[in-house]
A protein has these predicted regions:
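Membrane-anchoring alpha-helices and their flanking helix-loop junctions
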Residues: 1-71, 85-110, 318, 324-474, ...
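Glycine- and acidic-residue-rich phosphate-binding/metal-coordinating active-site segment common to enzymes
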Residues: 28, 206, 226-262
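Non-heme Fe(II)/2-oxoglutarate
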Residues: 110-191, 397-399
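Conserved hydrophobic/aromatic beta-strand scaffold that supports enzyme active sites
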Residues: 121, 216, 233-237, 262-264, ...
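Conserved double-stranded beta-helix
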Residues: 156-241
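Catalytic core of Fe(II)/2-oxoglutarate
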Residues: 243-341
Length: 548
């Protein structure tokens, strides 16, 4: 009987919606629900069904409470005598409305797994901002700190004009505006963290003390795993600087910050370093370090907690840092060495794996111990394809270094699954071995010819110009990276014992690969350029570059 009711509902929507595409999507969704109900209904009693409905309703309401989001129903319920009629209309159109909202999202779901570029920039130029910066310069000049090591004045210990000046630049429209250019104001909160702020004066040299950290690639904080929330450090150049450059390793950008230039970066995740140019500054380099916590509005207090954690760590690290600027005795010299050693190891972890990725993979592995023996393999074998597809779809505002790190990390896990299972079920099959060696050999040769950056969307993401390759293997095989990878994958599948144990693994790899290849073909962002000189070389070289 319920099938007839569903059919009547879908037919009535065809007239009511007056939108064929939306109606087709709604009908397909209802058909899917009916199919699932046919499978699950026999295993549920009436009591179980009522419990499930109650859990769903309570969970929905709890989600609204946690996120602080009002429901549409709450805006009219009990407000007028006719509100039940509006409730019926609301319920009738609820599913197509949800689908329509999904289609018209301001930001695609694909952006959730994209390696976004979170570095933000601005420049303070108006009279009020310049006056505030000059107040800071005058303060430092009057204090006249030693030039052979860094000097620090914490915001909370400042007084008078200099504190007012610091507060001004911390809250000025230009400073806050650079965050709103990156984060939607209707979705995020941006709040200052005064307890972390300071006036910083650079030293003229560094000599195996904790100052050396600044000249070593590093991340500032340890809370990179805390999801969806950011603590920003903003480096604001107070005076002229033509000597010291600030570089962001993964974003591949950098330069001298001078006279009101400001750059903000994720305190816990962004690898950065400073270096000296041959030119010398006339005066000491003065910088204001400002900090902000940025979190989704729906996180509420949970977002603020990241700011609290960062403040605690910054205070602890600050005390250690000050004690090791001029280390005395073996203990403090060892502590200074330990600061540098730990900084380098954390940098290596973030650059080549990413603590987020490591923790995520570890969590999936642990979950797999309770869910299914194959869960970890299924959850991590196709992640890199999803990242390819999502990144190619979004393309704007991508941190190329982080993207490349992430896909290589998960691709390595995927290949490890293939190799481990191949060895576990190994039986001698010369054709299988030959296909793997030839296929991945061809794919590797194509990667070497293109280079790693071009292989991983370097051209599509605008970080490099295309290198039109006409030599081996592009002069022998069309699309050698795709062809080679597919041959290698099918080589795994060729071995009977591997195929019997994991009949769907390689077909799923091939399906994901083909999905992305079709995406590139359909959304060919360079198709207007093929007749302008690249022609066949470009098709064989710069495009279709992903290795499985």
């Amino acid at each position: 009987a319920y099938e007839a009711l569903v059919g009547a509902y879908v037919i009535s929507l065809f007239v009511a919606l007056k939108n064929v595409g939306l109606w087709v999507a709604t009908a397909a969704w209802m058909a899917g629900l009916v199919a699932v109900a046919e499978v699950l209904a026999p295993s549920f009693s009436t009591t179980d069904a009522l419990k499930l409905m109650a859990v769903g309703y309570v969970g929905q309401e709890l989600a609204h409470i946690v996120t602080g989001e009002k429901t549409f129903q709450s805006t009219y319920q009990f407000k007028t005598p006719s509100w039940p009629m509006l409730l019926l209309e609301h319920t009738y159109f609820l599913l197509p409305l949800c689908i329509d909202a999904l289609v018209h999202m301001k930001e695609s779901f694909a952006s959730w797994i994209v390696a976004h570029n979170y570095v933000v920039r601005c420049k303070l130029t108006n009279k009020e901002d310049k006056r505030a910066l000059q107040t800071v310069v005058d303060f430092v000049t009057k204090e006249d700190p030693a030039r052979d090591c860094t000097a620090h004045w914490w915001y909370q210990r400042l007084n008078g004009d200099v504190k007012e000046a610091f507060t001004h630049v911390m809250e000025c429209p230009e400073m806050m505006g650079m965050f709103w250019k990156r984060f939607r104001s209707d979705c995020y909160n941006v709040e200052a963290i005064p307890a972390m702020n300071e006036i910083y004066v650079a030293s003229s040299h560094h000599n195996n003390n904790s100052d050396t950290v600044f000249y070593t690639q590093h991340c500032d904080g340890p809370w990179s795993v805390y999801p969806f929330c950011h603590v920003y450090r903003v480096m604001l150049a107070v005076n002229e600087n033509k000597q010291v450059e600030t570089h962001f390793t993964m974003e591949r950008s950098g330069g001298c910050l001078s006279d009101g230039d400001a750059v903000g970066f994720d305190y816990n995740r962004e690898i950065h370093v400073i270096s000296d140019l041959p030119t010398k500054n006339v005066d000491r380099r003065i910088t204001c370090k400002l900090h902000y916590v940025v979190y989704p509005k729906c996180f509420g207090w949970a977002g603020k907690v990241k700011g609290t954690l960062a403040t605690w760590y910054n205070t602890t690290a600050r005390n250690l840092f000050l004690a090791t600027i001029k280390p005395r005795g073996l203990v403090w010299k060892f502590m200074a060495w330990n600061v540098i050693f730990t900084t380098k190891r954390v940098r290596e972890l973030e650059m080549y794996a990413g603590l987020n990725n490591v923790v995520f993979a570890a969590a999936l592995y642990v979950a797999g111990q309770f869910i299914h023996p194959r869960f970890f393999m299924c959850a991590t074998s196709f992640t890199h394809y999803c990242m390819y597809i999502a990144t190619y779809h979004v393309r704007e505002g991508i941190n190329f270094g982080v993207f490349k790190r992430n896909v290589v990390f998960f691709k390595t896990i995927a290949l490890t699954h293939l190799c481990v299972n191949y060895l576990m079920h190994f039986e001698y099959d010369p054709v299988s071995l030959a296909m793997i060696l030839v296929g991945y050999g061809l794919s590797t040769a194509a990667t070497v010819a293109l280079g790693m950056d071009q292989t991983y969307f370097g051209v599509e993401l605008g970080v490099m110009k295309p290198n039109f390759v006409s030599g081996f293997p592009y002069n022998c095989v069309p699309h050698p990276m795709i062809v080679g990878s597919m041959i290698g994958l099918l080589g795994f599948h060729k071995m009977a014992s591997f195929r019997a144990a994991l009949p769907y693994l390689v077909p799923m790899h091939c399906a994901m690969y083909m999905t992305h290849m079709i995406q590139e073909q359909v959304r060919d962002i360079y198709k207007k350029d093929w007749g302008k000189g690249g022609k066949g070389k470009a098709r064989g070289g710069a495009r279709k570059t992903k290795a499985a």
